[in-house]
Amino acid sequence: MQAVRIGVTTATLAMLSTAAAAQAPGIAFGKNEYLRSCASCHGVSGKGDGPVAKSLSKPPTDLTRLADNNKGVFPVSRIYEVIDGRIQVTIHGTREMPVWGEVYTREVRTRAPRAMPDEMIDAMVRVRILGLIEYISTLQAK
């Protein structure tokens, strides 16, 4: 019975923490993540003109045109899958773009308490990726 109570308490805390984290990031969080993880290649404006762009085998994607290139619809799911590594973008050649989902997971695991459940770590990574996507959506050409 004690194990069931601990399991329910852990699950409840995880859900509450996930809900709080999901509300916390906002645009500022996503912008900071973008500047830290993406701007060196994609540029501050998202046009693919970052300081590292010229050293890549293929130019980075112009992130300001994602919706335009998808019939006016911002492709949230596809962007999520590119960031977390489920989709390899051919323009990146041999995957010059880091698999940020793996990078974020390693960072969270390094900082997280040893007993933190995998579900909580996954939720923290999801929040980080979603904050980044939310910010990228604000870069779309008008």
Predicted regions located by residue number:
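Extracytoplasmic electron-transfer domains, predominantly the class I c-type cytochrome c fold
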Residues: 56-119, 132-136
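Bacterial N-terminal signal peptides
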Residues: 7-17
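Short, non-ligating residues that shape and space the ligands of small metal-coordination modules
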Residues: 47-48
